[in-house]
Every structure is written in structure tokens, then in C-alpha cells.
A protein has these predicted regions:
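Short amphipathic alpha-helices within nucleic acid-binding modules
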Residues: 27-31
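A structural detector for beta-sheet-dominated domains
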Residues: 7-9, 23, 55
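A short, exposed loop/beta-hairpin motif centered on an aromatic-Gly-Thr core
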Residues: 13-24
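Short, mixed-charge low-complexity intrinsically disordered segments
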Residues: 34-70
Length: 70
């Protein structure tokens, strides 16, 4: 498992970046899409694969400061 930063590219949505623990970049995107689907009462997520970019895997020692992972 790795930590990935999933970045929202489409400013139409909340614009929040998400840190996700996943096996791959694609799984990290899918987890975020599933999150937005749940926020949409289980209906198809308005957020698509094309709305997201993924950085990572992120190594915790790459960060100089402590931070909240959302």
C-alpha cells in the first residue's frame, strides 16, 4: 500500500485534494470517485477519472511539516 495525493482538476467541484492509501494510482482515483458517489446518495458520481490527477506515491519523510490527511 502507498499514500497518494489525488488532486481535483475540475474547479466546478470542491477543489479539495485528498490523500488516499491505495495499492495503485488508479485505485486511489477510484476511491475518491466512490467517495463522491456516496456524497451523491449512491447515484453515479459527477466526478470522473478525467477530473482527477494523482501524485505519488508520497513518502511521509518527503514532508517537512506535520499535516492532516483528509
Amino acid at each position: 500500500m502507498h499514500i497518494y495525493e489525488v488532486i481535483m482538476l475540475n474547479t466546478e467541484y470542491d477543489g479539495e485534494d485528498h490523500f488516499v492509501i491505495a495499492k495503485s494510482k488508479q485505485r486511489a482515483k477510484n476511491i475518491v470517485i466512490d467517495y463522491y458517489e456516496q456524497e451523491n446518495d449512491g447515484y453515479m458520481s459527477p466526478v470522473t477519472d478525467h477530473d482527477l490527477a494523482v501524485n505519488g506515491p508520497v513518502e511521509p519523510e518527503d514532508y517537512a511539516e506535520e499535516m492532516l490527511l483528509n
